[in-house]
């Protein structure tokens, strides 16, 4: 039996992939049932391969990254921390670096620095409606089920 490994540790990669696969399978089932699905989690481009694979299965997958300025991100994270302050700051700084320049996925980012929750929801809906955050598969661009990551 395996025990939980804190997700930020390097040795948690296999566990993190299992979590992504579990999200993915649940999302697919809901989507096949006719539901639009939003997966809310930390999904960096390094975890997109499984999502790109389901595009080949005709799922419509939008990849949207909510990102505030570094200062605002640090403020929000410290306010809701479950870890000690020093560990939390270190983790958030690491994640900030990982998400600060997403290369080809920069167009998928919504800057939430000054957004209220309502503003953020509106921006996400707009991004979905516009199709600007869709993931595409080189082999097949057809889509039929809607999943937002």
Give residue ranges: language-model regions.
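Conserved ATPase "switch" residues in P-loop NTPase domains
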Residues: 27, 31-32
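Conserved phosphate-donor/acceptor-positioning beta-strand/loop module used by diverse small-molecule
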Residues: 57-77, 110
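Conserved substrate/cofactor phosphate-moiety recognition/catalytic segment
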Residues: 1-22
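Short catalytic-loop micro-motif centered on adjacent basic/acidic residues
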Residues: 37-40, 109-111
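Short, electropositive alpha-helical surface patch
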Residues: 46-63, 125
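Small-molecule kinase domains that catalyze NTP-dependent phosphoryl transfer to phosphate-bearing small molecules
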Residues: 79-123, 132-149
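Short strand-turn motif at the edge of the Rossmann-like AdoMet-binding core
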Residues: 41-42, 68
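Loop/turn-to-beta-strand initiation segments
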Residues: 33-39, 62
């Amino acid at each position: 039996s395996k025990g939980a490994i804190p997700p930020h540790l390097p040795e948690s990669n296999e566990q993190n992939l299992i979590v992504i696969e579990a999200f993915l399978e649940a999302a697919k089932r809901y989507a096949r049932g006719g539901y639009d699905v939003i997966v809310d989690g930390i999904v960096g481009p390094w975890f997109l391969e499984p999502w790109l694979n389901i595009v080949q299965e005709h799922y419509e997958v939008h990849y949207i990254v909510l990102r505030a300025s570094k200062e605002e991100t640090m403020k929000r994270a410290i306010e809701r921390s479950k870890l000690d302050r020093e560990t939390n700051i270190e983790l958030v700084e690491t994640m900030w670096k990982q998400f600060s320049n997403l290369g080809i996925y920069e167009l998928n980012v919504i800057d939430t620095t000054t957004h209220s929750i309502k503003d953020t929801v509106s921006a996400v809906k707009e991004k979905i409606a516009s199709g600007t955050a869709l993931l595409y598969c080189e082999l097949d661009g057809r889509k039929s089920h809607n999943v937002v990551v």
